[in-house]
């Protein structure tokens, strides 16, 4: 049988695995009558910058579900250690012509396609940038203090200096801005595969943040400051928070 390949040059990949330690079967969790993965897919599929949006999964149940609602999906290896590895496998096997790849976490059901479009535009406008990711300003003390939310500091040119689960920078003055990292990355093709070929690093393992591996190997990640900040789903109890958010933002296209 002929191998399926796509000619798309700008691709959004939604990695979705069944066996999450924190929330088994999370992609199929229902949120106001639609699955988490469907909500994420349908939001991102409105993108005007991407040629293709595709779910990459290691589980037939997820694939069947995505195909049932009319989405595109491919099966990947269960050996992938994280979403970036699953994204890279998808691009390597199915998208030989892809130049810009956006890795979109499947647990972001409220993420708007405009965020993805902004990242793609950044890579198109600035050829020297290899990787770009969104951040959003916060004043919420819980978000700042919890280790479930990743914070980012960056220089005056928008280049990330560090990502941490701890509050950074340390706040001596109330007006100091704090930025939350949103788990979406736009890569140039070479940058994605350079990450895959790199070895794990001490800080990335200490913080359990894969993006630190790029910084520790001397790579650069640029940030794109966005207004949109919405809840993600990490645990079963987050479903209720997301449903409340969607109910309050019912005028948005969810």
Curated annotation (Swiss-Prot):
It is found in: Cytoplasm. One of its GO terms (biological process) is CMP-keto-3-deoxy-D-manno-octulosonic acid biosynthetic process. SUPFAM superfamilies: Nucleotide-diphospho-sugar transferases. One of its GO terms (molecular function) is 3-deoxy-manno-octulosonate cytidylyltransferase activity. The keyword Cell inner membrane does not apply. Pathway: Nucleotide-sugar biosynthesis; CMP-3-deoxy-D-manno-octulosonate biosynthesis; CMP-3-deoxy-D-manno-octulosonate from 3-deoxy-D-manno-octulosonate and CTP: step 1/1; Bacterial outer membrane biogenesis; lipopolysaccharide biosynthesis. Pfam families: CTP_transf_3 (PF02348). InterPro entries: Cytidylyl_trans, KdsB, Nucleotide-diphossugar_trans. Its EC number is 2.7.7.38. Disulfide bonds: none annotated. Keywords: Cytoplasm, Lipopolysaccharide biosynthesis, Nucleotidyltransferase, Transferase. One of its GO terms (cellular component) is cytosol. It catalyses: 3-deoxy-alpha-D-manno-oct-2-ulosonate + CTP = CMP-3-deoxy-beta-D-manno-octulosonate + diphosphate. Belongs to the KdsB family. Activates KDO (a required 8-carbon sugar) for incorporation into bacterial lipopolysaccharide in Gram-negative bacteria. This is 3-deoxy-manno-octulosonate cytidylyltransferase.
């Amino acid at each position: 049988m002929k191998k399926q390949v796509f000619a798309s040059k700008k691709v959004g990949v939604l990695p979705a695995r069944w066996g999450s330690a924190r929330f088994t079967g999370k992609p199929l969790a229902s949120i106001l009558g639609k699955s988490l993965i469907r909500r994420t897919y349908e939001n991102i599929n409105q993108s005007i910058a991407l040629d293709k949006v595709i779910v990459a999964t290691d589980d037939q149940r997820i694939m069947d579900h995505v195909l049932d609602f009319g989405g595109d999906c491919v099966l990947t290896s269960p050996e992938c250690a994280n979403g970036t590895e699953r994204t890279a496998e998808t691009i390597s096997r199915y998208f030989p012509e892809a130049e810009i790849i956006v890795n979109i976490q499947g647990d972001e059901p409220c993420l708007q396609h405009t965020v993805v479009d902004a990242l793609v535009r950044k890579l198109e406008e600035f050829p020297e940038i290899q990787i770009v990711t969104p951040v959003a300003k916060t004043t919420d003390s819980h978000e700042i203090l919890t280790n479930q939310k990743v914070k980012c500091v960056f220089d005056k040119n928008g280049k990330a200096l560090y990502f941490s689960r701890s509050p950074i920078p340390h706040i001596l003055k109330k007006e100091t801005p704090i930025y939350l990292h949103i788990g979406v990355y736009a890569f140039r093709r070479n940058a994605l595969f350079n990450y895959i070929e790199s070895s794990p690093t001490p800080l990335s393992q200490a913080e359990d943040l894969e993006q630190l591996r790029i910084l520790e190997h001397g790579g650069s990640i640029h940030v794109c400051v966005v207004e949109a900040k919405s809840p993600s789903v990490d645990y079963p109890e987050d479903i209720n928070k997301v449903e409340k958010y969607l109910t309050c933002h019912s005028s948005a296209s969810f």
